[in-house]
Amino acid sequence: MERFKKASSIIETLKQQGHEAYFVGGSVRDLIIDRPIGDIDIATSALPEEVMAIFPRHVPVGLEHGTVIVVENGEPYEVTTFRTESEYEDFRRPSSVQFVRSLEEDLKRRDFTMNAIAMTEEGKMVDLFAGQEAIQKREIMTVGNAADRFQEDALRMMRGIRFVSTLGFSLETKTKQAIETYGHLLEHIAIERITVEFEKLLTGTYCVKALKELVETKLFSHLPYLQMSEEKLLKATQYKWDSFEADIEAWAFFLYCIGEEHPAVFLRQWKFSNKKIKDIVAVLLTIRKRKEKDWDTVLLYKTGIHIAEMAERVYEAMIESYDHTAVNRVQTLFQALPIKNRQEMNVTGNDLLNWASKKPGPWVAEMIQKIEEAIVQGNVVNEKECIREWLQECNLL
């Protein structure tokens, strides 16, 4: 409750000004579950302009949705006006938002009962939709009619299965049936938004359970490049998933599990940045080399520590060894390298031109590469004079 106490002065101030205010959303849910708490959000009957007038230190981040960030005790908190939403457009966004003075009206527009619990600054729960009961049953259940909630915003179906992965809860029967019925509406949602949810699913503690739900609800058939992948996904559930430290690792492991032969093509369908695609593919290529042999200085140097660490974690998950000292060994080997990158070489192309008295040409880059490999392999010390002597001994000058 300590973090809520730091924010309670916002609620107290709003109430002193004649408004209602409560803690709401995921932070309240996680407090009940006893999970680490993320951002703390506050809902209030005060209109956005009233919130801004009461709190001088504020940032008007989403006034059309009623949200103002209030800075209190050095921490930012989202304060959002109670609201209802009109008819939804394209199964993803409301055509308009109306501010209201009723907490119940605000809570009943939310996705799942576990996320529709409010809490006073004293810690008293306001649970109008049996959210605590759902948490006790470890069930993910929509607020009101599941068909209505998913037709309002189809992304809620992906969120539901993402919560299976992060919380280990199960989909309530009617909620699950509605996902099976309305899964096709997910095709109206921007790929980028789906990717965010799927990434959280892949990095969740209960990922295997969530992947099984994707298959059972047939929701996978409306995801990019997975339309015909039921057998592949079931194959992925046979692996023991570790909790990966980076989303790149999780994607690499997932692509390995489903046996994806064209990872770059797959990832482009999910609208990843070129940088992220490059990193995930690099991890997969490194794992392929790692399967053939253990790390040596040349492989580690060419790979770089960032990709090498991720590749080793994924490799350990693939072979189900879960040797948590393996990455430490990679780090130790990398620290022992004579140089970590080409910029640390104590020789330049100009040095070679001066020593050889030859015209510039492709030979300079080729020679730099030979010197680089020799330094990494320990065949020559990374000192200018030593490098010159080595070149002469090898008749390379």
From Swiss-Prot:
Signal peptide feature range: none
Transmembrane segments: none
Record InterPro entries: Bact_CCA-adding_enz_type3_sf, CCA-adding_enz_C, CCA-adding_enz_firmicutes, NT_sf, PolA_pol_head_dom, PolyA_RNA-bd
Cofactor(s) essential for the protein: Mg(2+)
Oligomeric and partner information: Homodimer.
Further comment found in the protein's record: A single active site specifically recognizes both ATP and CTP and is responsible for their addition.
HAMAP family the record matches: CCA_bact_type3 (MF_01263)
Similarity field: Belongs to the tRNA nucleotidyltransferase/poly(A) polymerase family. Bacterial CCA-adding enzyme type 3 subfamily.
Name of protein: CCA-adding enzyme
Organism: Bacillus cereus (strain Q1)
Lineage: Bacteria, Bacillati, Bacillota, Bacilli, Bacillales
